Design a protein with these regions (language model features):
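Conserved alpha-helical substructure of the radical SAM core
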Residues: 2-128, 139, 143, 147, ...
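Radical SAM enzyme [4Fe-4S]-AdoMet core and its adjacent flexible, acidic
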Residues: 1-10, 31, 53-55, 119-242
């Protein structure tokens, strides 16, 4: 049985199942750009000191080719930026598809995710798209994301999901929701908003992203206190290559 998105995330983030093996992870993630059109209060992107730019296309193609030679099976074209801001994204998906990657995916804030663009990405070979939408109300969305685009994002999500159901039933459309004390709606209310317009909703507590979220104590939910204060290893070296 295929894993749902929550199971895949839980497997990657399982701190109790980390082993040093003489094999590479099956998943790689390529940051095609570190540019972003949001300023989310829980995200380290706005604290980034690196130059804002898109990746060199030759480097992406080289990485995809070499990773496939090493038996990598899954590729995500995002890390800490908005992938739809890179005009070469469709070319990268095409290359990954040509190399027979089994699972190709992105996460987006959804602002630029118009159905015409996503249709093109699905046609090229994108297997799933995850919308990062971290509020269920317009004014609160503006507070969390630092931009007033709630209506735009919700419209894009609805249209992309309809597109998926009508033309791309094997593709998946997900929603992720990061909880802070400023958007701490009940899971029931969150799912009520999204569950009819996507395949699955993933709700997670805010993380400190390697200590880059200096105000984590001010924005975390009270019930999330232990997971924030415990010192845990980064799971990426064990489960993925970034």
């Amino acid at each position: 049985m295929a894993q749902n998105i929550q199971e895949k995330i839980s497997e990657i983030e399982n701190f109790n199942n980390m082993k040093i093996l003489n094999i590479l992870p099956k998943n790689i993630m390529i940051e095609v750009t570190n540019k972003c059109n949001c300023k989310c209060i829980f995200c380290a992107n706005r604290k980034m000191k690196r130059q804002r730019r898109t990746i060199d296309s030759n480097l992406v193609n080289k990485a995809l080719t070499e990773a496939k030679m090493l038996k990598v099976k899954e590729i995500g074209f995002y890390v800490n930026g908005e992938p739809l801001m890179d005009n070469n994204l469709n070319n990268y998906i095409k290359k990954a598809k040509e190399l027979s990657y089994e699972y190709i995916y992105i996460t987006t804030n959804g602002i630029l995710a118009k159905k015409e663009l996503i249709q093109k990405l699905f046609e090229t070979g994108l297997n799933s798209i995850k919308f990062s939408i971290n509020s269920i109300e317009r004014e609160n969305y503006k507070l969390i994301h630092g931009i007033d685009k709630f209506d735009t994002v919700m419209r894009n999500l609805k249209e992309v999901y309809i597109l998926k159901k009508e033309k791309f039933p094997d593709c998946r459309v997900y929603v992720s929701y990061i909880k802070t004390k400023y958007n701490n709606y009940s899971d029931r209310d969150i799912k009520k908003i999204f569950e009819e317009i996507c395949d699955e909703v993933v709700i997670q507590n805010v993380k400190n992203q390697g200590g880059l979220i200096s105000n984590i104590e001010k924005i975390k939910c009270e019930e999330n206190k232990e997971s924030i204060t415990r010192k845990l290893p980064c799971f990426y070296p064990f489960k993925s290559i970034v």
